[in-house]
């Protein structure tokens, strides 16, 4: 069921979204060569719990049937990992690209956002892929308006990405969000204009395209969480939580520092 947030609930979503963005700002200086992704998780967990007074939503989250609960507080997806990478003793190296995905719960409401980071100087391909994904996310967000449809968002993303000769992952998508981490509707990053659910003021959704440098096909690893590109090509993702307003949209997870 799609939930329409009251003005009071929207205010709580704004707070949760702002705090999630603060986590991504805080961790940025720590994303460097020689640092293990589990250390990034530890840093974020401590900040989320002790500094912000929030709950890290991914920790012990139960996803698909049969999969173990997610064991960490953030997702770290490096290079060809598309999404849901589990922080580990894997040490970052110069040239890596990494997506850090953070979801916090504050006063019962979720703020969900992710951002790409470069470890040292990126390759030309990595730089271009990351920028195209970022621009695609914003094209999708700018397609949000009351009376529009989710297909408008997906089409804006897909058409731009494919025009740039990259591919959009189809097996994973954005979602409604609020008191529940993953609510209806599904927010596909591909589609046709005018298709899908109508956008109504008070809806809160995530827009989080996953864009591959190679083919769009992905596979799920044996841990039940980590998703990688089948052809081992690089993948990038950006994410914001967005409120549908009477005038258009409001991004709830913008960095207080103006980034993202």
Residue locations for each model-derived region?
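Active-site neighborhoods and metal-handling regions in enzymes and metal-associated proteins
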Residues: 1-260
């Amino acid at each position: 069921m799609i939930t329409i947030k009251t003005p009071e609930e929207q205010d709580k979503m704004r707070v949760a979204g702002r705090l999630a963005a603060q986590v991504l700002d805080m961790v940025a200086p720590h994303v460097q060569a020689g640092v293990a992704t589990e250390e990034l998780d530890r840093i974020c967990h401590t900040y989320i719990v002790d500094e912000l007074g929030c709950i890290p939503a991914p920790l012990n989250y139960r996803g698909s049937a049969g999969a173990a609960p997610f064991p960490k507080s953030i997702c770290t997806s490096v290079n060809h990992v598309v999404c849901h990478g589990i922080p580990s003793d894997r040490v970052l190296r110069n040239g890596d690209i990494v997506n850090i995905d953070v979801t916090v719960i504050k006063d019962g409401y979720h703020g969900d956002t992710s951002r790409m980071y470069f470890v040292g100087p990126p390759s030309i391909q990595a730089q271009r892929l990351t920028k195209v994904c970022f621009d695609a996310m914003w094209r999708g967000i700018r397609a949000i308006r009351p009376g529009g449809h989710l297909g408008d968002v997906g089409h804006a993303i897909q058409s731009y990405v494919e025009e740039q000769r990259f591919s959009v992952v189809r097996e994973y998508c954005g979602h409604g969000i609020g008191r529940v981490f993953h609510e209806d509707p599904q927010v596909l990053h591909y589609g046709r204009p005018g298709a899908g659910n109508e956008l109504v003021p008070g809806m809160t959704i995530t827009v989080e395209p996953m864009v591959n440098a190679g083919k769009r096909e992905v596979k799920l690893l044996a841990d039940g969480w980590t998703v990688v590109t089948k052809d081992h090509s690089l993948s990038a993702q950006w994410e914001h939580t967005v409120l549908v307003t009477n005038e258009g949209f409001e991004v709830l997870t913008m960095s207080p520092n103006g980034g993202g």
